[in-house]
């Protein structure tokens, strides 16, 4: 069960009649470290979402890893739709805390929960679709970043194997983008 004290709270700005989320624990910690980020609405499970500029991604990922978020559970991408942005997302977990609990039972408080945070990098569809690779920080991002490149066209600077993972090398376009047009016919080029 999620502790209500760690879920960012929606507050109304009466001067501008807009709504803004109060920072969660991770966001407050990042602010204390001097790292620039954007507070986003928590997901349906109450997990804190943080918007990150591409230029800040590696610094924030390194800071979070040093703060215990040592496991990249998932990395991927999605398309917000026609005219929308492309998004590269990262789900980070404090797995070390859980591992310590299993090695030495009864070290966690009985009501402790799995600590997780989600990072999102928003990219303009017609802009620069390049994000720094997190491979040097989380080796598990290898194939996940390649799949995101293959399906959405988001390239990862500094990735050691920047090539398609699922589609043939000569494939045109990115199949999971909302503006993708399916070809009527594709003849695979066999490299003999």
Swiss-Prot record:
Documented EC number(s): 7.1.1.-
Enzyme class name: translocase
Catalysis: reaction(s): a quinone + NADH + H(+) = a quinol + NAD(+)
Topology with respect to the bilayer: Peripheral membrane protein
GO molecular function, one term: NADH:ubiquinone reductase (non-electrogenic) activity
Alphabetized UniProt keyword annotations: Membrane, NAD, NADP, Organellar chromatophore, Plastid, Plastoquinone, Quinone, Thylakoid, Translocase, Transport
Xref: InterPro entries: NADH_DH_suC, NADH_quin_OxRdtase_su_C/D-like, NADH_UbQ_OxRdtase_30kDa_su, NADH_UbQ_OxRdtase_CS
Pfam families: Complex1_30kDa
SUPFAM superfamilies tied to this protein: Nqo5-like
UniProt keyword Nucleotide-binding, yes or no: no
Disulfide linkage: none
Subcellular locations according to the entry: Plastid, Organellar chromatophore thylakoid membrane
GO cellular component: organellar chromatophore thylakoid membrane; plasma membrane; plastid
NCBIfam families in alphabetical order: PRK12494.1
PANTHER family assigned to the protein according to its UniProt record, in alphabetical order: NADH DEHYDROGENASE [UBIQUINONE] IRON-SULFUR PROTEIN 3, MITOCHONDRIAL, NADH DEHYDROGENASE UBIQUINONE IRON-SULFUR PROTEIN 3
Function, in words: NDH-1 shuttles electrons from NADH, via FMN and iron-sulfur (Fe-S) centers, to quinones in the respiratory chain. Couples the redox reaction to proton translocation (for every two electrons transferred, four hydrogen ions are translocated across the cytoplasmic membrane), and thus conserves the redox energy in a proton gradient.
Family according to the record: Belongs to the complex I 30 kDa subunit family.
Assembly and binders: NDH is composed of at least 16 different subunits, 5 of which are encoded in the nucleus.
Listed name of the protein: NAD(P)H-quinone oxidoreductase subunit J, organellar chromatophore
Native source organism of the sequence: Paulinella chromatophora
Organism phylogeny: Eukaryota, Sar, Rhizaria, Cercozoa, Imbricatea
Record gene name: ndhJ
């Amino acid at each position: 069960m999620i502790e209500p004290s760690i879920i960012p709270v929606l507050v109304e700005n009466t001067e501008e009649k807009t709504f803004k989320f109060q920072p969660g624990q991770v966001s407050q910690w990042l602010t204390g470290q001097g790292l620039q980020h954007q507070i986003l609405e928590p997901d349906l499970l109450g997990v804190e979402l943080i918007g990150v500029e591409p230029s800040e991604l590696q610094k924030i990922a390194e800071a979070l890893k040093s703060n215990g978020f040592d496991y990249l559970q998932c990395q991927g991408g999605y398309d917000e739709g026609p005219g929308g942005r492309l998004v590269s997302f990262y789900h980070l977990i404090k797995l070390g805390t859980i591992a310590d609990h299993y090695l030495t039972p009864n070290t966690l408080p009985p009501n402790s929960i799995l600590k997780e945070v989600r990072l999102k990098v928003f990219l303009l569809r017609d802009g620069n679709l390049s994000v720094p690779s997190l491979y040097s920080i989380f080796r598990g991002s290898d194939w996940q970043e390649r799949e995101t490149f293959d399906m959405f066209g988001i390239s990862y600077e500094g990735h050691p194997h920047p090539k398609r993972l699922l589609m043939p090398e000569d494939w045109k376009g990115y199949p999971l983008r909302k503006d993708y047009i399916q070809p009527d016919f594709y003849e695979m080029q066999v490299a003999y």
